[in-house]
């Protein structure tokens, strides 16, 4: 569960409506793979991940980023039940994919960075703080099965 004030909820919902989630997802996942190259090991089937330009232009990275951000979007609709919303994905990433749960936090930070890039001056420090709460809640929910 994420506890947001009414002002934080308004900021998150208002700003989220101003971005193209598909662009945010692909760019955030791409940045994760570039900035933290050890995360590439989970994406062997994605083809060429040999350089930043290859990663950022990779259609499989963009497609998976879209899936990631669609799940994130579902989380925004269920901030009071993130553990329930992400239970299946938590189990999948823990039991089948064996993803290090720290990567969820790293990806959340990439989402925040990309939002800042796309929203510019509208992404105020208060808006960033609200989104940091959300991505921390999502990362915690995704890591829930690991506990």
UniProtKB/Swiss-Prot annotation:
Heme b binds at residues 64, 93. Residues 3-147 form the Globin domain. The keyword Transmembrane does not apply. The modification N-acetylvaline is found at residue 2. It comes from the Eukaryota. Pfam families: Globin. The modification Phosphoserine is found at residues 45, 51, 53. One of its GO terms (biological process) is hemopoiesis. Keywords: Acetylation, Heme, Iron, Metal-binding, Methylation, Oxygen transport, Phosphoprotein, Transport. The modification Asymmetric dimethylarginine is found at residue 105. The keyword Phosphoprotein applies. GO terms for cellular component: extracellular space; haptoglobin-hemoglobin complex; hemoglobin complex. GO terms for molecular function: heme binding; hemoglobin alpha binding; hemoglobin beta binding; hemoglobin binding; metal ion binding; oxygen binding; oxygen carrier activity; protein-containing complex binding. The modification Phosphothreonine is found at residue 124. Red blood cells. The modification N6-succinyllysine is found at residues 18, 60. Involved in oxygen transport from the lung to the various peripheral tissues. PANTHER family: HEMOGLOBIN FAMILY MEMBER (PTHR11442), HEMOGLOBIN SUBUNIT BETA (PTHR11442:SF42). Belongs to the globin family. Heterotetramer of two alpha chains and two beta chains. This is Hemoglobin subunit beta-1. It comes from Rattus norvegicus (Rat). The lineage of its organism: Eukaryota, Metazoa, Chordata, Craniata, Vertebrata. The gene is Hbb.
């Amino acid at each position: 569960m994420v506890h947001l004030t009414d002002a934080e909820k308004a900021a998150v919902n208002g700003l989220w409506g101003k971005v193209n989630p598909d662009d945010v997802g692909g760019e955030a996942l791409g940045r994760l793979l570039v900035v933290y190259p050890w995360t590439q090991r989970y994406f062997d089937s994605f083809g060429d991940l040999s350089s930043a330009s290859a990663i950022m232009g990779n259609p499989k990275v963009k497609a998976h980023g879209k899936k990631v951000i669609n799940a994130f979007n579902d989380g925004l609709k269920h901030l009071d039940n993130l553990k329930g919303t992400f239970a299946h994905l938590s189990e999948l990433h823990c039991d089948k994919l064996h993803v290090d749960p720290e990567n969820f936090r790293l990806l959340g930070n990439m989402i925040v960075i990309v939002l800042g890039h796309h929203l510019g001056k509208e992404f105020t420090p208060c808006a960033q703080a609200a989104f940091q709460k959300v991505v921390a809640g999502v990362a915690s929910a995704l890591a829930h099965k690991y506990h």
